[in-house]
């Protein structure tokens, strides 16, 4: 198995159902990844160590998902120069809005690229990581272009079906 280029990390194993969507997106592009659990609050030393050592494992992008206080992506970004993508996880309160705000509101100098809340966000995090890696990989860039074409073709098909259904 090849070294992981992307690290998917989550604050709790209860986030796995959502973060699997990032893994599926990466698998669709043939990108190797690792997946783990670490907590910004319950295991801060482990989280900092994980972030510091990611590049030495061959990781080039980190995707971090967390709910509630959702400081995981920010703590990781504070301990690495690798790009960090934050996925806000919906929590029992505020439907994930709290997670979104905690993930997106980073101080200047510690960027976290934040995507949408939940499964759509996790999918987009995987695709965004692929786009970052595609900047230095022509074969991956081609796969990304093909992905966009597939999406566009799907819309075209839906448009045709709708026009037929409506008789226009």
Where are these regions (language model features)?
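C-terminal binding/interaction regions
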Residues: 4, 10-17, 21, 97-168
């Amino acid at each position: 198995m090849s070294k992981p280029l992307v690290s998917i990390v989550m604050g709790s194993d209860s986030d796995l159902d959502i973060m699997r969507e990032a893994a599926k997106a990466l698998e669709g592009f043939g990108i190797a990844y690792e997946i783990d659990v670490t907590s910004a609050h319950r295991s801060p030393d482990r989280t900092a160590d994980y972030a510091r050592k990611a590049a030495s494992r061959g990781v080039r992008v980190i995707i971090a998902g967390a709910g509630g206080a959702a400081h995981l992506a920010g703590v990781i970004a504070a301990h690495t120069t690798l790009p960090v993508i934050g996925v806000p996880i919906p929590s029992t309160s505020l439907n994930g809005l709290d997670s979104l705000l905690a993930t997106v509101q980073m101080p200047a100098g510690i960027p976290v690229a934040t995507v949408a809340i939940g499964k759509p966000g996790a999918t987009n995090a995987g695709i965004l990581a692929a786009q970052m890696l595609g900047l230095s990989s022509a074969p991956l860039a081609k796969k990304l272009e093909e992905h966009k074409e597939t999406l566009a073709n799907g819309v075209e098909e839906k448009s045709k079906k709708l026009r037929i259904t409506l008789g226009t």
